[in-house]
């Protein structure tokens, strides 16, 4: 059962750079990395739809399709991590939880109906799959600094991102962290004296420390019969099971959930791109 770590932060907060440095610090093959699937969102389906660009150009119209696709991508990644039982630490660029809790809420053009749909889908997937993060590393970055980085890297799909949106996103991240039941380690990354390598080392040591704490706690729970970390012998093939408990019950299988999210994805690809 992997230990899921989510690297969170605003747009251009340095998540990708941090993950790159963490790769170099990883001591062995037990660290597995899952970057955000941005390229997938820019080439969806046979028509190669750039859903990310469409969202930034018209966030009111395409926020729900994008956030739905983001959730689908994250479920697929976390299923892959779950099935890699030898992996002790899985590092994800952003958590599943932030899709509905941050980005859906941060869009001022999101209608109440769209927010409800995003939240309902999020709740369904949380209940029926293993998408929970064990720890969140949050890169706290000033919105103005993020805007400067966005301007510098000059990605076509980000050219309409403005300071107001980034400030709104920043505020929703703060609220998300305040509400979160998941342990959060906040790292300030605006200090020009600190290198990416120094920030990565801080994150690396935090992850190792929290993993040790989690492992000690989990061992006690196993001994007390509270949960079973992997699939018991009487269950079906482990690569089709999301979670098994000692009494033999199980959540919805990965196979069934995959079919559900594929149906949702097919609906996304029918989006009006005119």
Predicted regions and their residues:
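NTP-dependent small-molecule kinase module
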Residues: 147-274
């Amino acid at each position: 059962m992997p230990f899921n770590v989510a690297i969170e932060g605003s747009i251009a907060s340095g998540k990708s750079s941090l993950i790159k440095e963490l790769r170099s610090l990883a001591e062995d093959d037990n660290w597995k990395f899952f970057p955000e699937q941005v390229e997938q969102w820019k080439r969806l389906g046979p028509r190669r739809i750039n859903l990310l660009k469409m969202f930034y150009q018209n966030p009111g119209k395409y926020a729900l399709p994008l956030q739905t696709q983001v959730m689908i991508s994250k479920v697929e990644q976390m299923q892959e991590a779950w099935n890699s039982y030898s992996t002790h630490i899985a590092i994800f660029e952003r958590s599943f939880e932030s899709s509905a809790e941050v980005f859906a809420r941060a869009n001022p053009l999101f209608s109440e109906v769209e927010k409800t749909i995003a939240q309902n889908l999020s709740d369904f997937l949380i209940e029926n799959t293993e998408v929970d993060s064990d720890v969140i590393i949050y890169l706290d970055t000033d919105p103005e600094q993020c805007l400067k980085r966005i301007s510098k890297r000059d990605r076509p799909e980000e050219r309409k991102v403005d300071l107001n949106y980034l400030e709104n996103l920043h505020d929703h991240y703060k609220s998300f962290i305040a509400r979160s039941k998941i342990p959060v380690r906040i790292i300030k990354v605006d200090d020009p004296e600190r290198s990416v390598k120094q920030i990565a080392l801080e994150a690396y040591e935090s992850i190792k420390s929290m993993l040790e704490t989690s492992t000690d706690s989990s061992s006690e729970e196993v001994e007390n019969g509270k949960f079973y970390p992997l699939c018991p012998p009487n269950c079906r093939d482990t690569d089709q099971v999301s979670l098994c408990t000692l009494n033999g019950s199980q959540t919805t299988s990965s196979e069934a959930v995959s079919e559900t999210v594929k149906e949702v994805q097919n609906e996304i690809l029918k989006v009006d791109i005119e």
